[in-house]
A protein has these predicted regions:
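Acetyl-CoA-dependent GNAT
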Residues: 1-54, 58, 77
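Conserved beta-strand-loop-alpha-helix junction that forms the acyl-donor binding cleft
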Residues: 87-97, 101, 113-123
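Conserved acetyl-CoA pyrophosphate-binding loop and the N-cap/start of the following alpha-helix
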Residues: 61, 65-73
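Residue-level detector of high-confidence beta-strand sites
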Residues: 38, 108-110
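Active-site beta-strand termini and strand-to-loop segments that position acidic
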Residues: 30-32, 122-125
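Short hydrophobic clusters on alpha-helical segments that form packing/core surfaces
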Residues: 74-78, 96
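Conserved GNAT acetyl-CoA-binding A-motif
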Residues: 78-89
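A short, internal acetyl-CoA/4′-phosphopantetheine-binding micro-motif in the GNAT/acyltransferase core
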Residues: 55-62, 89-90
């Protein structure tokens, strides 16, 4: 599936499903047909939610806006189908935290949870997550 490219991202980004089951999907992130990263999804029918995991852009492609573009695309796509889109991020994953802050996410002042992770909610259409 193609990710529409804006003028500043002259190269073409796309997602290619690498594997899929009822509750999980793994996709390669492609730039002009070459793999530059990956992203995984876990689907929870009972609460109509999707969790994002294993989201990674290769080191040589970081800092160029590709992660932002992919994440915005995924959120826009899945908020049409799901009531909740979220992820957990390790407290020491500074690159991911920087990306999520760029998208307007605020991190809990009390710090991460007992697993040293932050819960990041990208979209919530009335799902009680408490």
């Amino acid at each position: 599936m193609k990710i529409n490219s804006n003028e500043s991202l002259a190269k073409k980004l796309s997602l290619r499903t690498a594997s899929r089951s009822k509750n999980e999907a793994y996709s390669d992130i492609l730039l002009d047909g070459n793999k530059i990263g990956e992203i995984a999804f876990s689907f929870y029918d009972d609460i109509n939610a999707v969790g994002i995991g294993n989201f990674e852009i290769s080191a040589e492609h970081r800092g160029k806006g590709y992660g932002t573009k992919v994440l915005k695309f995924v959120i826009d796509k899945y908020k049409k189908k799901f009531d909740l889109i979220y992820c957990f991020v390790d407290a020491d994953n500074y690159g991911a935290i920087k990306l999520y802050k760029k998208l307007g996410k605020v991190f809990d002042e009390d710090g991460p949870n007992v697993n040293n992770q932050y819960y990041v909610e990208f979209y919530n259409n009335g799902v009680d997550v408490e």
